[in-house]
Amino acid sequence: MEKVKPWLGEPQNTIAVLQKYGFVFQKKYGQNFLIDPHVLDKIVAAAGIGPDDFVVEIGPGIGTLTQYLAYAARSVCAVEIDKNLIPILEDTLSDYDNVEVINNDVLKVDLAALAKEKNNGRPIKVVANLPYYITTPIIMGLFENHVPVDSITVMVQKEVADRMQTGPGSKDYGALSLAVQYYAEPYIVANVPPNCFMPRPKVGSAVIRLTRHEVMPVETKDEKLMFSIIRASFNQRRKTLANGLKNCLLYTSPSPRDGATS
């Protein structure tokens, strides 16, 4: 079956689909659909999607980015929490036989098992236009649960992308910066203005690619302890480090110095 070129990226086509189904945006899901083909092409290119790739897309919406991914990849699994979008996805993706849609909360999906089943356990690529309110739990969940991921290429709030990529000495440097950079190398691909979305978000956005480290930059015996110390340290910036560590999660053993080695 010859793949059909993506067509949903054009604003008029998005509007037509929304009107056809009388779709009402759900604020609780943070829905902002991309309507710029150039940005969509840039996301797929940044993710390095090729004909051998199995891709997991989080939050496909009406299937706009999904079409672009399906056109480039071997297969796509799209996880959508909003049941009202499922009939729309069945329509907009009907020309693509390499897409599977799962109606579920991605935080409840065993992506490691999915990778094992669909990709023979090989690292997968994750691509998403993420709801901004749940960006950090999703990204850190992928890393902390040790899902076999090659890279994560996502649209996020620009402020969050800056925090992920920034280095020591910046006012934006914090626990999120350290956590993301422990697992991956972040690279901001592009800044995306509000007019590239429907409806327009109130904040600027950015596409960021997180490439998983082949070798971890730090060896640790206890990731949970290490990140507890990191969070406590940054939460107590105006207090002494000793007081910050004292307020860390109630670990009595081992000693904090045993939690990480360089």
PLM-predicted stretches and their roles:
Residues R163, R237-R238, R257:
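Short, cationic motifs built from Arg/Lys/His that form the positively charged side of catalytic pockets
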Residues A232-S253:
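C-terminal lobe and adjacent flexible extensions of AdoMet/dcAdoMet transferase-like proteins
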Residues M1-A232, C248:
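Catalytic cores of RNA-modifying enzymes
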